[in-house]
Amino acid sequence: MAAKEIKFSTEAREKMLRGVDILANAVKATLGPKGRNVVIDKSFGAPRITKDGVSVAKEIELEDKFENMGAQMVREVASKTSDIAGDGTTTATVLAQAIVKEGAKAVTSGMNPMDLKRGIDLAVAAIVAELKANARKISNNSEIAQVGTISANGDAEIGRFLAEAMEKVGNDGVITVEEAKTAETELEVVEGMQFDRGYLSPYFVTNADKMRVEFEDPYILIHEKKLSNLQSMLPVLEAVVQSSKPLLIIAEDVEGEALATLVVNKLRGGLKIAAVKAPGFGDRRKAMLEDIAILTAGTVISEDLGIKLESVTLDMLGRAKKVSIEKENTTIVDGSGAKTDIEGRVAQIKAQIEETTSDYDREKLQERLAKLAGGVAVIRVGGSTEVEVKEKKDRVDDALHATRAAVEEGILPGGGVALLRAVKALDAVKTANGDQRVGVDIVRRAVEAPARQIAENAGAEGSVIVGKLREKSEFSYGWNAQTGEYGDLYAQGVIDPAKVVRTALQDAASIAGLLVTTEAMIAEKPKKDAPPPMPAGPGMDF
């Protein structure tokens, strides 16, 4: 085991504070509409330019082990906030720095660190309750656009795209962000249920120009197993032919003889038919087939349910207004499933999302939910250079998370004002002793930090701005850093999601409180490099 170096009390806190400051100073330069960019060197490819706090924090690694510990703890604040709320990472870092600084001063002057932490926790709980009480539910699409615009660093185009995407696919819909091949940013919305399986044979194509199968008002046969011959399917095929409607077969696979027979019948013109593989694998495949069945009011033909292919009737087949099948994907539009059944299935999937502990499972469940509930929107981010596209994509990701958070828990005035106004809740906080009261006052001062930093990044004097804001008591009265004007921030469209503000404060206080109570730090001693071997002297060669 390598030898360790230990630092105690003031010396430990000073080292830690230096690390916190180095990381926070790099991150906080990005805060607000007039925040600057940070350039990050990459070991391969062009440097990355970003204004995303967590991306900056993740790149910082300090040489001094003790300073690095402080920096890594604050990096954890940014990562945690990013994971939960998706935005607000810079605000969380600024708050953590302010609480650690004030807390370290109080500990050095002889306060009890544990009581300080209890005071900090009491204050945070009171402010969070005040924020929740003042949060406004999102009432229209323009507010979603405003949240997106603020989060994307004042880029109104991104805000507009996000609002449009959420309007089209609903709050449960999936919105994905990709890099475009062109200089333009564009939005593509896929309505209905789409899954990533295409036609099994190009001979099924009905629209040769676009190389796709297009069916109006088809029947849909949903089969869990492979189809290797059509003998057992003949009764249902004959019934479909008599109805003169197209038929889509979704099965684990359609092989050899069965596929050849379907293709021959299609080419001879007697049968409008297409076959695709079922989406997903294993248990997820079963669940997705059930989803398709509920969406189209069909039945999954499964031997587990005791249904044999020979006994299938037309009323067991699903129906949809339109089906479009391309080489790589299939889209079912306007399935004829009952609204109550679909809502029941959506509620069931939401419950599974709440219960699951796996991020991968949660992502897959969210996708299934979106396909049932609304659709999928893809925002393709364009730019003149790869560096620009990556920087813009970071901002779109932030804005997307912020708009989702806003829909979830409502909105608050932006610009750091919500935290400033929520301070009035601290007057009613009861503490057990003077040291806890100092802990409460640490938070009272620390929550000014985001508003000060936004002002300073915009070239104004933070203390003057905060002083002017304190003169007024209206909750939404603040300073717009973009225009330099005072007024109602709701009316000016300067708004933050309540979830982002709340999470930033809770995560910052959680880690900062632990840093304040640190009394000793332990790190491995740096290894001394062994001296190089002596060169052979004259007359010593063998």
UniProtKB/Swiss-Prot annotation:
InterPro entries assigned: Chaperonin_Cpn60_CS, Cpn60/GroEL, Cpn60/GroEL/TCP-1, GroEL-like_apical_dom_sf, GROEL-like_equatorial_sf, TCP-1-like_intermed_sf
Keyword annotations of the record: ATP-binding, Chaperone, Cytoplasm, Isomerase, Nucleotide-binding
Pfam families: Cpn60_TCP1 (PF00118)
Entry's localization field: Cytoplasm
EC supergroup of this enzyme: isomerase
Reactions listed under catalytic activity: ATP + H2O + a folded polypeptide = ADP + phosphate + an unfolded polypeptide
Positions with a binding annotation for ATP: 30-33, 51, 87-91, 415, 496
Any one of the GO BP annotations: protein refolding
The enzyme's E.C. designation: 5.6.1.7
One annotated GO molecular function: isomerase activity
Main location: cytoplasm
Domain of life: Bacteria
UniProt keyword annotation of Ribosomal protein present: no
GO CC, any one term: cytoplasm
Record-annotated membrane-spanning stretches: none
Task of the protein: Together with its co-chaperonin GroES, plays an essential role in assisting protein folding. The GroEL-GroES system forms a nano-cage that allows encapsulation of the non-native substrate proteins and provides a physical environment optimized to promote and accelerate protein folding.
Subunit record text: Forms a cylinder of 14 subunits composed of two heptameric rings stacked back-to-back. Interacts with the co-chaperonin GroES.
Family stated for the protein in its record: Belongs to the chaperonin (HSP60) family.
Protein name (database record): Chaperonin GroEL 2
Naturally occurring in which organism (per UniProt): Rhizobium leguminosarum
